[in-house]
Amino acid sequence: MGSRRAPSRGWGAGGRSGAGGDGEDDGPVWIPSPASRSYLLSVRPETSLSSNRLSHPSSGRSTFCSIIAQLTEETQPLFETTLKSRSVSEDSDVRFTCIVTGYPEPEVTWYKDDTELDRYCGLPKYEITHQGNRHTLQLYRCREEDAAIYQASAQNSKGIVSCSGVLEVGTMTEYKIHQRWFAKLKRKAAAKLREIEQSWKHEKAVPGEVDTLRKLSPDRFQRKRRLSGAQAPGPSVPTREPEGGTLAAWQEGETETAQHSGLGLINSFASGEVTTNGEAAPENGEDGEHGLLTYICDAMELGPQRALKEESGAKKKKKDEESKQGLRKPELEKAAQSRRSSENCIPSSDEPDSCGTQGPVGVEQVQTQPRGRAARGPGSSGTDSTRKPASAVGTPDKAQKAPGPGPGQEVYFSLKDMYLENTQAVRPLGEEGPQTLSVRAPGESPKGKAPLRARSEGVPGAPGQPTHSLTPQPTRPFNRKRFAPPKPKGEATTDSKPISSLSQAPECGAQSLGKAPPQASVQVPTPPARRRHGTRDSTLQGQAGHRTPGEVLECQTTTAPTMSASSSSDVASIGVSTSGSQGIIEPMDMETQEDGRTSANQRTGSKKNVQADGKIQVDGRTRGDGTQTAQRTRADRKTQVDAGTQESKRPQSDRSAQKGMMTQGRAETQLETTQAGEKIQEDRKAQADKGTQEDRRMQGEKGMQGEKGTQSEGSAPTAMEGQSEQEVATSLGPPSRTPKLPPTAGPRAPLNIECFVQTPEGSCFPKKPGCLPRSEEAVVTASRNHEQTVLGPLSGNLMLPAQPPHEGSVEQVGGERCRGPQSSGPVEAKQEDSPFQCPKEERPGGVPCMDQGGCPLAGLSQEVPTMPSLPGTGLTASPKAGPCSTPTSQHGSTATFLPSEDQVLMSSAPTLHLGLGTPTQSHPPETMATSSEGACAQVPDVEGRTPGPRSCDPGLIDSLKNYLLLLLKLSSTETSGAGGESQVGAATGGLVPSATLTPTVEVAGLSPRTSRRILERVENNHLVQSAQTLLLSPCTSRRLTGLLDREVQAGRQALAAARGSWGPGPSSLTVPAIVVDEEDPGLASEGASEGEGEVSPEGPGLLGASQESSMAGRLGEAGGQAAPGQGPSAESIAQEPSQEEKFPGEALTGLPAATPEELALGARRKRFLPKVRAAGDGEATTPEERESPTVSPRGPRKSLVPGSPGTPGRERRSPTQGRKASMLEVPRAEEELAAGDLGPSPKAGGLDTEVALDEGKQETLAKPRKAKDLLKAPQVIRKIRVEQFPDASGSLKLWCQFFNILSDSVLTWAKDQRPVGEVGRSAGDEGPAALAIVQASPVDCGVYRCTIHNEHGSASTDFCLSPEVLSGFISREEGEVGEEIEMTPMVFAKGLADSGCWGDKLFGRLVSEELRGGGYGCGLRKASQAKVIYGLEPIFESGRTCIIKVSSLLVFGPSSETSLVGRNYDVTIQGCKIQNMSREYCKIFAAEARAAPGFGEVPEIIPLYLIYRPANNIPYATLEEDLGKPLESYCSREWGCAEAPTASGSSEAMQKCQTFQHWLYQWTNGSFLVTDLAGVDWKMTDVQIATKLRGYQGLKESCFPALLDRFASSHQCNAYCELLGLTPLKGPEAAHPQAKAKGSKSPSAGRKGSQLSPQPQKKGLPSPQGTRKSAPSSKATPQASEPVTTQLLGQPPTQEEGSKAQGMR
């Protein structure tokens, strides 16, 4: 058995069953016969012992090798490849080739029929040669008499074997030549066609379809049967065998099938996912071809299934085990019995994923799982059920939203969840909050919960509204669930248990939730003092969840605005917090859903939601306030109502972006508090009670403060108390600190002032808005104002009529603040201006208190305290954003990250110092001290942060860094006052409330930039897309997740504290300080996380720079924060990097140092690399997508920010600098790994992993786990080795093997550090990983790396494919007489309303000629010239040349051929759809262009045909006409804005192609764009596209929203655009609005009629979106939901080139 054959024989064994362990390199080398193997096994222990004993491996190895040499001395002949039958026309040459192995070397004899052929005297008729073990019989100028059975017989001393092939010779007629050969083919094709058509629909929907398919092609089924149970799946292979006929291939297929019997289960599981995917419909055509695949090869079905298995194996297992155990068993049985049947059944639902979207499946699985769980409740059925119940319990709306928006939202939330997962970990609880509430309500304090819920839902008097919020929760829970699935492994039981699932899925969250909400419920009555003393998380949660009903509402309401700012991050937190306060949850969910699922809804219905949310919050606030304090309630209520009104109004204009933020802000404030609380709860379950008490106390204090503030508006003590309270609220996390906070109020205020100075906007405002009730309103108003200021452009409407004065004042304050920290006076004035000046006196008093910190700062600070006075009320809402927020941030951060936070605070303080000046500088430590002391005596930590805190610091540090960056960004934002950027900046960093509001709303886990992008999108109905575009690479997401987890903890604590301090939320600068940890432990974390996470890969130094740039970018995004704040920002950033470096180091110290073994294994490095890659895995898409969205919306902003460009660079860097990043990232990576370790399943698609990681990180166990991870990390047992496929196609197979895969993992292949594909691996799936290199050529030389990573770690192995290595393989056989093919045209019978169907097949023969250039896509496609012999008329005449293109790199799995065929099929089908659909669009464009006088010639996109080559291991390819000349690129996604040819310098064809792009973009409302065109003259090919939504018209792998945005911002109209009357594109912001406007669909009036087709197309799109069908109902909604889908699936789609997608799909 040759080494080559081993793999084909069985991947599992790699050719060697027992020898695998000792010599990694020996596997392929020796493949002994059974006898020798047995002998070897008995001998081996001695060898291995000796090698172990002698610390001299070489001696042991040599002994082992010598033994093997002896054992394998004599083996009987064996055909690695057998003869293939040929059918040729007369005068053609034929070559029969076989590869024979054996020892001694066999002697091969050739026979014609039964006559032996002379080895030496055959010429001129034939020639017998052999090269190595390859034996060839060449026949020249065949005649009919040469038709015969040719046989090769190999013999040696051990035996004799033979194989034969049939030669048919006929005249030049298709019929004669193929009478026999093609009769079979045609029958098969007919059956296949039927199968495809039926399987597309049936396979997905009907598992029983398998039977139908079988009935359709009984032959195949019977063949399978004959093959035997193990080979049952092999029938396709057998089918192929007759055609291509390689025994090895057949066996391999069998093996794969057999191996995949388990896959069936997984597939079955996946099927649910697939169904959930919603990709099924679009993939029907593609998947439908699964039937084709089935027909071609059950192997192919197996392949897709395997892909599913890999991708969702773990998940499937989870689901199967958890929910589908029953199904799984049957499936296993089925798999064993008729794996194919099982697979067919499973593929029917699973196939879409397996076939075309493994990558998507990963994400979708995550996504789908939630959905599936909801529907199925497999692994996460419990959680899902719980969530559903929660949704149902929460409110019908919630349930409704979950069902309808859920899928889309899930996708959207996927992103958020990815980022928020950490937060979300809690949030799922929050989401489940209703559930949790329900669950807890019974066991824990239903009263508290009910009140909370009643308050949030009932009190608001808008259950529906709360439901909205809650509805989003279900979505989030789904997302969470999606991410939870990774956890489900560990938490499968939990999933099963609604509550358990909730608690476990977001372990911390559940725990905190479970504890905190109950505590909250129970503790709602808890005195403020108690509240103060609760754990931060607990406090946050308790505060949010367990304030008095009024307080809760108040907090929620108040928090809502603040949360709005930090809504994203908070959303996650809120999810957790939900149990604490459903109202909070609802807002958060609402925001999340609105942001995500309802991104379109948000825009369209977001206002409603926002209004509802606002209402709820207004009502809730009013009621809550009333409940809490009549006095405060009235003042607050007014404020809140005004704020609420503002919010509700503002949501409409700004709500899409801000509504979620505000609503989310409220909900999120609580959520964040809850999140922080929950996370902290994880950390401090015990403290949770305290926290709850503290929360209560805080709330009570807040309430008291509010009351006191209201009662004693001007009382300094009250102010102080308020301040202190705020601090408490701010440092809800560190309630203990809260008491100290009062003393530190001054310092904190200064700190806040610092923040304010940097982000004066929000800071001053909130104070101004009012004392306590006022401050609450002020907070809301301030938040809004800040948002207005920060989000001014974005949320012009943010200013609510009720609070307009306040807003005005706030804005003024913000402006003043932006101008300088000296806004103290203005702040006071503004405070006075604030409509809610009832506490105005107190405000002034508060201001004086704040003055302690510094004049301006003091003023702001005062405001902060004042706001804090209102912590329960407005403060909570805005505290984060408010000055309090800042202190809270620092304190809250400190509390949140207590140790780390303090450290961060320290750094933050200095950073603030930079921005604010000495007062702040001195105060931050004080503040920190207060915070620290209160929290954990962290003050010392702040200055001399204790190592312990630092241990926690990794996340905190990251958060702080992120926050600092945000702060800088905010200050810049405030300074720039750029609305959009400011919004994000302020929202994200500057004003925690505003910033948090805006960005948070956008994407909890996304960076501010991303958030802003999302916000913009939300406004433009592109939130989902934006989120997707913003999708961080898995790496980034993971980082975000980790950061978010830590920050969520810190953030929740901070939120709790910030919540108290949120009243002053307006202080943008404060936000930075607060942002440091408070802004969003979720958001700042997210934003920072993104930057920081990305930075982390770069390393501490890089982190600093990267972060800086990222932050700067965000800040720039935030609106040209370059102005005043930028100086401090820069400094802060500079400091932050240093700190970051410090902290990362510290964090690293917390993490165990990488051991030499670990380094050797590359586990850590690789971990980071995978992350990097993951980031890159977004592949072009993720980096490009993220970057692109960043670029298009942020491109200008980036320019504003010094580091901005760096951010994309960083992202881009991920693949190229993968190693560097990983090295630098090591610390972070470790953290991430820890998070990942905690995260049950990174495989979930990276997003889940990230979320899971976050959740895991939330656990304090993260570090210990990290330590454990080294042992649990995957290990390499077989390095990459290269083999040749046995079909003489010239294709190579790279494969390697990993073991110790203890959890769901993601396996990534990269070439020269550029990701080319990725597949999921379920826990325990240790089969080989393979990458097929089609028709290997020198173009394919390079360094290939295979990396596997999961939460325990990562491992990778490299291989350099050099020309020398290539030369050792025999290139593709030349002199062939061609190959039989089936060619299928794609027909759009219904125009673009149709996603395309397949026309009648043509059967013919091609002769492949020389290989053309690497083709498009950086070598991802191979193009070769072919000559048509016959059979393709009328499309191609005989003798015509055409071009065959095939994907060059295909990632497949253990059941090699099967999976390989599936990937090959999916990629090829996508290519056909892309080009042919673009051709249809081009036809419409041509019709309109011709109608325009003087337009001239119009480009034409040539059709692409699908061909199937039965004899090829990689059978699917595309065929197109040969344009005769080298292609010229007319437009390319590779061109940057700068690289794009200028209109004047480009050719007419190029200009018209760009006009076509513009027309198409406008015609499809910005949802479809042709990105690449190359051609000759006016004929175009090599089409690449970008869609805004994943699954758009079935195009699953082409979702690149970033490219759409980039095009919108970079396209320069030319004369032809004007000729067609196209509206100039003003960037994505303008474009998206266009997209929103249905009327603007047709760029030209004439187009309206034709526009119907695109619309129907869109309608059709939903089918691809399957699950998202509800979204399609309204265009806006579908867009939003689809983008959400895109987001979730965005990364996989980037694999379009067959890279990542190949594996994922």
Swiss-Prot record:
<dbReference type="InterPro" id="IPR036179">
    <property type="entry name" value="Ig-like_dom_sf"/>
</dbReference>
<keyword id="KW-0418">Kinase</keyword>
<keyword id="KW-0217">Developmental protein</keyword>
<feature type="compositionally biased region" description="Low complexity">
    <location>
        <begin position="557"/>
        <end position="579"/>
    </location>
</feature>
<feature type="compositionally biased region" description="Polar residues">
    <location>
        <begin position="666"/>
        <end position="676"/>
    </location>
</feature>
<dbReference type="GO" id="GO:0005634">
    <property type="term" value="C:nucleus"/>
</dbReference>
<feature type="region of interest" description="Disordered">
    <location>
        <begin position="308"/>
        <end position="749"/>
    </location>
</feature>
<keyword id="KW-0122">Cardiomyopathy</keyword>
<feature type="region of interest" description="Disordered">
    <location>
        <begin position="1"/>
        <end position="33"/>
    </location>
</feature>
<feature type="region of interest" description="Disordered">
    <location>
        <begin position="211"/>
        <end position="244"/>
    </location>
</feature>
<dbReference type="InterPro" id="IPR003599">
    <property type="entry name" value="Ig_sub"/>
</dbReference>
<feature type="compositionally biased region" description="Pro residues">
    <location>
        <begin position="736"/>
        <end position="745"/>
    </location>
</feature>
<feature type="compositionally biased region" description="Low complexity">
    <location>
        <begin position="1"/>
        <end position="10"/>
    </location>
</feature>
<keyword id="KW-0723">Serine/threonine-protein kinase</keyword>
<dbReference type="GO" id="GO:0106310">
    <property type="term" value="F:protein serine kinase activity"/>
</dbReference>
<feature type="compositionally biased region" description="Gly residues">
    <location>
        <begin position="11"/>
        <end position="21"/>
    </location>
</feature>
<feature type="modified residue" description="Phosphoserine">
    <location>
        <position position="1222"/>
    </location>
</feature>
<dbReference type="Pfam" id="PF02816">
    <property type="entry name" value="Alpha_kinase"/>
</dbReference>
<feature type="modified residue" description="Phosphoserine">
    <location>
        <position position="228"/>
    </location>
</feature>
<keyword id="KW-0539">Nucleus</keyword>
<feature type="compositionally biased region" description="Basic and acidic residues">
    <location>
        <begin position="679"/>
        <end position="700"/>
    </location>
</feature>
<feature type="domain" description="Alpha-type protein kinase">
    <location>
        <begin position="1390"/>
        <end position="1625"/>
    </location>
</feature>
<feature type="compositionally biased region" description="Polar residues">
    <location>
        <begin position="708"/>
        <end position="729"/>
    </location>
</feature>
<dbReference type="GO" id="GO:0007507">
    <property type="term" value="P:heart development"/>
</dbReference>
<feature type="compositionally biased region" description="Basic and acidic residues">
    <location>
        <begin position="647"/>
        <end position="657"/>
    </location>
</feature>
<dbReference type="GO" id="GO:0004674">
    <property type="term" value="F:protein serine/threonine kinase activity"/>
</dbReference>
<dbReference type="InterPro" id="IPR004166">
    <property type="entry name" value="a-kinase_dom"/>
</dbReference>
<feature type="compositionally biased region" description="Low complexity">
    <location>
        <begin position="370"/>
        <end position="382"/>
    </location>
</feature>
<keyword id="KW-0597">Phosphoprotein</keyword>
<keyword id="KW-0677">Repeat</keyword>
<feature type="compositionally biased region" description="Polar residues">
    <location>
        <begin position="495"/>
        <end position="504"/>
    </location>
</feature>
<dbReference type="InterPro" id="IPR007110">
    <property type="entry name" value="Ig-like_dom"/>
</dbReference>
<feature type="compositionally biased region" description="Low complexity">
    <location>
        <begin position="1120"/>
        <end position="1131"/>
    </location>
</feature>
<feature type="compositionally biased region" description="Basic and acidic residues">
    <location>
        <begin position="308"/>
        <end position="342"/>
    </location>
</feature>
<feature type="compositionally biased region" description="Basic and acidic residues">
    <location>
        <begin position="211"/>
        <end position="221"/>
    </location>
</feature>
<feature type="domain" description="Ig-like 1">
    <location>
        <begin position="77"/>
        <end position="168"/>
    </location>
</feature>
<comment type="similarity">
    <text>Belongs to the protein kinase superfamily. Alpha-type protein kinase family. ALPK subfamily.</text>
</comment>
<feature type="region of interest" description="Disordered">
    <location>
        <begin position="792"/>
        <end position="845"/>
    </location>
</feature>
<feature type="region of interest" description="Disordered">
    <location>
        <begin position="1628"/>
        <end position="1705"/>
    </location>
</feature>
<keyword id="KW-0393">Immunoglobulin domain</keyword>
<keyword id="KW-0808">Transferase</keyword>
<feature type="region of interest" description="Disordered">
    <location>
        <begin position="1082"/>
        <end position="1145"/>
    </location>
</feature>
